[in-house]
Amino acid sequence: MAHDPLEYLQSVLHRSTSYTYRMSFKIDASIANADERAFAAYSRLGEEIGLAFHVIDDQLNVAPVTEEWSKTTAEDIAAGKVTLQVLLILQRADRNRAAELVRILRASTTDQRELRNAVGIMRERGALIEARAIVGQHLDACLRIISNISNMNFRYRP
């Protein structure tokens, strides 16, 4: 059965990173005795924050904003990790460039020339820009949720 790779990645992230955030927000909502609507909003807020965090973390791994970035640049590529940027490239790159990226990922190489090549493939096809836009969509969703939370009922009792 064929699945959309982006939907698959979203489901993986839903079960991993966003789960951590979602659960902490659910605990907060429970402590505040949030009504059902507020509880659902807090859960969704945690999920959106978790998804945004995961995607931006993957992006910073291949395109850090400072030299002092604590992770080794492109370590996800060296580990053969399939990220949102990789899936976007596989959907839009020509066969040769997609095959080149897959080859580098499968090699689990630490060769800096190969890693720069992989990052270059992601840049030239706009995957990093599109991933950043997806982060923006998650953050916009967070803002919408937050703006509605003030209208919800909490029955906090110390």
Regions found by a protein language model. Give the residues of each.
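All-alpha prenyltransferase/terpene-synthase fold signal
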Residues: 1-158
